[in-house]
């Protein structure tokens, strides 16, 4: 079996955190005899600087040829003034859509060692373990028509479109039920069906799919209520399935329940579990080059990659256990540091995880 992984370090802290993730990947590869081939390229601002495009055609072909893609982060202020169609984020949107990565998995898992890092009371978040499944290739981020125009009265107007087809909803709903079946058998579908036509179709199709999953407890929630409930009582949720924009917002909100977005991995999968894996956090240009970024989200993204694309659960478990051991040792990067723990940099944290494997 081909086991080629395309490594895209990206922008900002991307290259720093990726170096640590690759260190862990190489160690686990050697320990488990997995035989990965690593191929390197650029995405985002780094790709724009090198190729004149945030996603070069040859990079896309490499991504198609690979079994999985591991990404650092994209974006930075130095590209804010270029043509919007060439911004780093457009490369990320394009690679997701071109690879057919329609399902984005964002876990929010609270490590007991970091219970104090959450801004919520420990009793509200203790034992938190939820998964947000976000539809990734449809909805308002891709909908046409979109644009700007000047009205007859001279006023500027901008507009976007939020379309969803039945097939797009059906496949993400099916993925949601499948994930719920692997976990706590509870699925909450989040929409805005009291206002949006797209959400009304969403809810109807989710209900249809539910008939094939009688063992899963399905509930529906409006997105405004879901945002409130995530803060009020987050442990009521097991798997949340929602559209592109709602999922974008709710998954970032859920990430802070855990205390640091620097701890959270994500996976974007196609229909065959080929995927792109990346940390939930951004490129953090304000700390780039300082050696203080938290590499654990990227390292845990490697674990997700091993679990979902390569079906190497033992190797994935080993990485997750190693991260737990490092936290038990009291090692913390600046974003998760608290009194009584030891502050370490990016490289030292990566080395500690390798040593714990």
Swiss-Prot record:
Q: Which cofactor does it need?
A: Mg(2+); Mn(2+)
The pathway this protein participates in, as annotated, is:
Amino-acid biosynthesis; L-leucine biosynthesis; L-leucine from 3-methyl-2-oxobutanoate: step 3/4
Write down the position(s) of the site called Important for catalysis. 141, 192
Which SUPFAM superfamilies does the UniProt entry name for this protein? Isocitrate/Isopropylmalate dehydrogenase-like
Where, subcellularly, is it found? Cytoplasm
Positions annotated to bind substrate: 96, 106, 134, 224
Task: Give the keywords, sorted.
Answer: Amino-acid biosynthesis, Branched-chain amino acid biosynthesis, Cytoplasm, Leucine biosynthesis, Magnesium, Manganese, Metal-binding, NAD, Oxidoreductase
Q: How does it assemble?
A: Homodimer.
Q: What is the name listed in the Swiss-Prot or TrEMBL entry for this protein?
A: 3-isopropylmalate dehydrogenase
**What species is given as this protein's source?**
Xanthomonas euvesicatoria pv. vesicatoria (strain 85-10)
